[in-house]
């Protein structure tokens, strides 16, 4: 009975690119939902704890929930048929990722050292942490495909290593990740089976989907960094 079915809820937090993508997906499909910012709504945070969850985005209807990053699962919870989009070929995604990272490096180079610890609006994350996170995303992907390291939610938390302190440190790290991505694609990427399971924390997806998410995830945050430049008048 749709009249008594629990309302669809989306749990999110500001500055979360996956959260934005999840809400856009539901809106594009004409789905109404209750939007719950877990940083401001303690009830929402407790709802997630009751489900045994400590991450966002989450789409839930009662006790039935899905990680917002997996659209086929989101569609199931929301009650409509999921129509997968045509993904770009892996090589094209890698090219786009390189373009995104190059742009992010330019944005980072323009942020004054004294502004790096400025916080993003409504989110406990600094420009320094955001810059690191943009390049951390492909690093976690590479650690996963090259070294079989677990692709976990914790691995993507933007906690800077002790040896990354200055803007120059960040830019050096950025160059290392970019070089590593290029080498991986040139040596192993072209022969990788992207239809294999992605083996990631957020659901059952292919490695192709994980690669695609790597590109748009870094891309969304790069746009945030570009807006940060506007905010500080650059």
For every predicted segment, state its role.
Residues 1-32:
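Local sequence-structure signature of Cys/Sec-based thiol-disulfide redox active-site neighborhoods
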């Amino acid at each position: 009975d749709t009249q008594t079915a629990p309302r669809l809820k989306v749990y999110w937090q500001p500055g979360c690119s996956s959260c934005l993508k999840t809400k856009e997906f539901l809106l594009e499909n004409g789905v109404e939902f209750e939007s719950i910012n877990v940083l401001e709504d303690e009830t929402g945070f407790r709802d997630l704890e009751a489900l045994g969850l400590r991450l966002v985005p989450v789409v839930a209807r009662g006790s039935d929930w899905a990680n917002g990053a997996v659209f086929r699962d989101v569609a199931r919870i929301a009650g409509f048929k999921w129509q997968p989009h045509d993904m770009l070929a892996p090589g094209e995604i890698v090219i786009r990722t390189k373009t995104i990272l190059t742009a992010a490096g330019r944005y980072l180079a323009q942020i004054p050292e004294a502004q790096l610890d400025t916080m993003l609006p409504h989110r406990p994350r600094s420009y320094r942490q955001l810059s690191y996170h943009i390049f951390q995303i492909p690093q976690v992907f590479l650690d996963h495909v090259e070294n079989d390291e677990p692709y976990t939610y914790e691995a993507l938390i933007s906690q800077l290593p002790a040896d990354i302190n200055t803007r120059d440190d960040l830019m050096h790290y950025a160059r290392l990740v970019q070089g590593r991505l290029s080498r991986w694609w040139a040596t192993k990427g072209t022969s990788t089976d992207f239809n294999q399971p992605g083996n990631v924390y957020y659901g059952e997806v292919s490695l192709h989907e994980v690669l695609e998410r790597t590109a748009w995830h870094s891309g969304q945050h790069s746009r945030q960094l570009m807006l940060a430049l506007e905010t500080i008048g650059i």
